[in-house]
């Protein structure tokens, strides 16, 4: 071991110690900051997480049932799986408005066997894997088709994008370990993370790749004699790894892509695949994520290695509307709340998930408040002790999110309404402008 290795080891030990201390502080304060926390240790890390759109309310029970879409990252040490998890969440304090002392989270109720914390009085939250499907290599990203949630697309380390019809696979994976996707989307030669189903045109899907391309497939063109499908178009505007891609939520022909070339490109599929409609150098570092507003057709956000989230107006991309700054490391993912037009979340390598409310930009602050961050920063989730890999808002529970991390942890959490209290219920999408 040379001197540089020793210094690196010392730095890693110091960082782990700091992380552990911060977690102890977070755990101590959690009952006052959250209405709900479920922490579950998976067998292997998941690089992806997404709520499925269904929700069940069993008769006579004080909980609701939700499903999560997860993957595995075994680093070649074990079989990889596409996974479906069932989550039971207590109705009181979650779907309801109760925040009494007896219904709040009791962090002393920690289940060592399940690696879970989180309960409300008589009802304990639970997360369990209910279906596993063999997968070829790690799953970098998995997303369900908005028009048919049984159709799941996955980005593989092989460079291929796989389509699985969940209903055609048993809940228990076949013992031979063979991956049997229903459709294999070909056309890219390296792995990637960006994956986006069109919310407006069923069966249209985009994938971003480290080979600098974005591919567009229409699975309606798939024919059964051959389970592979070539792309309808391959977009070649980036000069480095394409990190993320997303369809526009209101215009079926538009999508955006971002990459390590620091570029944000806006594409129109009716125009040539080598000529983006707009091109802008969005950040001073690599751009890792983007998301179009679900409410306002003009607004989108980008997350970058320069530690900031950029807010953009499609009508004038020459000037960034605003920069959200509080993270201390690169931004890994961004996503908009489905319940509040001005609210979004960002996950960072600093192990934090930040919640932002754009309607609060420019509000006056006391010096003490300013020390905690800008006025638009409304909550910091500090429950992860390692880098978050993905995050998603619940479609059913206001303010509830799930986030996964590199240390096998997947969390379901909901900040206390008393802490959030944004008071933005009366805002319209135009307030973003």
UniProtKB/Swiss-Prot annotation:
Transmembrane segments: none
Region (Interaction with the histone H4 N-terminus): 368-372
The WD repeat ranges on this chain: 134-174, 187-227, 237-277, 282-322, 326-366, 383-433
GO CC aspect terms: cytoplasm; nucleus; Rpd3L complex; Rpd3L-Expanded complex
One biological process term in Gene Ontology: chromatin remodeling
Top-level taxon of the source organism: Eukaryota
Keywords from the UniProt entry: Chromatin regulator, Cytoplasm, Nucleus, Repeat, WD repeat
InterPro entries in UniProt: G-protein_beta_WD-40_rep (IPR020472), Histone-bd_RBBP4-like_N (IPR022052), WD40/YVTN_repeat-like_dom_sf (IPR015943), WD40_repeat_CS (IPR019775), WD40_repeat_dom_sf (IPR036322), WD40_rpt (IPR001680), WD_repeat_RBAP46/RBAP48/MSI1 (IPR050459)
Oligomeric and partner information: Component of the HAT-B complex composed of at least HAT1 and HAT2. The HAT-B complex binds to histone H4 tail.
Similarity section: Belongs to the WD repeat RBAP46/RBAP48/MSI1 family.
Function: Regulatory subunit of the histone acetylase B (HAT-B) complex. The complex acetylates 'Lys-12' of histone H4 which is required for telomeric silencing.
Protein name per Swiss-Prot or TrEMBL: Histone acetyltransferase type B subunit 2
Organism this protein belongs to: Mycosarcoma maydis
């Amino acid at each position: 071991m040379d001197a540089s290795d020793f210094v690196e080891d010392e730095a890693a030990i110091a960082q782990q110690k700091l992380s552990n201390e911060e977690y102890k502080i977070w755990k101590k304060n959690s009952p006052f900051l959250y209405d709900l926390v479920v922490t579950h240790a998976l067998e292997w890390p998941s690089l992806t997480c997404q709520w499925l759109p269904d929700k069940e309310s069993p008769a006579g029970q004080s909980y609701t049932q939700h499903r999560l879409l997860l993957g595995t990252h075994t680093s070649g040490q074990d079989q990889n799986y596409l996974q479906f998890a069932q989550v039971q969440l207590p109705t009181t304090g979650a779907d309801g408005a109760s925040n009494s002392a007896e219904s709040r989270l009791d962090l002393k109720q920690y289940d060592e066997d399940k690696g879970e914390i989180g309960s409300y009085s008589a009802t304990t939250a639970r997360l369990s894997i209910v279906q596993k499907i063999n997968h070829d290599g790690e799953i970098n990203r998995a997303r369900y088709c908005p028009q048919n949630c049984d159709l799941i697309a996955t980005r593989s380390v092989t460079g291929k994008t796989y389509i699985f019809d969940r209903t055609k696979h048993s809940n228990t994976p076949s013992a031979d370990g063979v991956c049997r996707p229903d459709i294999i989307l070909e056309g890219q030669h390296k792995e990637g993370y960006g994956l986006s189903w069109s919310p407006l045109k069923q069966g249209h899907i985009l994938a971003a790749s480290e080979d600098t391309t974005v591919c567009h497939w229409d699975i309606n063109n798939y024919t059964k004699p051959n389970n592979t499908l070539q792309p309808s178009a391959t977009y070649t505007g980036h000069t480095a790894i394409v990190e993320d891609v997303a369809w526009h939520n209101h215009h079926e022909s538009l999508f955006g892509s971002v990459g390590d070339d620091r570029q944000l490109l806006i594409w129109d599929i009716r125009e040539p695949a080598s000529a983006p409609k707009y091109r802008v150098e969005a950040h001073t570092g690599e751009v890792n994520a983007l998301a179009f507003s679900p409410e306002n057709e003009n607004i989108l956000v980008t997350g970058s290695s320069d530690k900031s989230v950029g807010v953009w107006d499609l009508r004038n991309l020459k000037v960034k509307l605003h920069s959200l700054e509080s993270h201390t490391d690169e931004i890994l993912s961004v996503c908009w709340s489905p319940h509040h037009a001005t609210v979004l979340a960002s996950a960072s390598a600093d192990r934090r998930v930040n919640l932002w409310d754009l309607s609060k930009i420019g509000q006056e602050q006391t010096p003490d408040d300013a020390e905690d961050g800008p006025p638009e920063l409304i909550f910091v989730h500090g429950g992860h002790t390692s880098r978050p890999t993905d995050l998603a808002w619940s479609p059913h529970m206001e303010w509830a999110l799930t986030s996964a991390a590199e240390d096998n942890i997947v969390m379901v959490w909901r900040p206390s309404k008393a802490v959030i209290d944004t008071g933005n219920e009366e805002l319209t999408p135009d307030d973003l402008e």
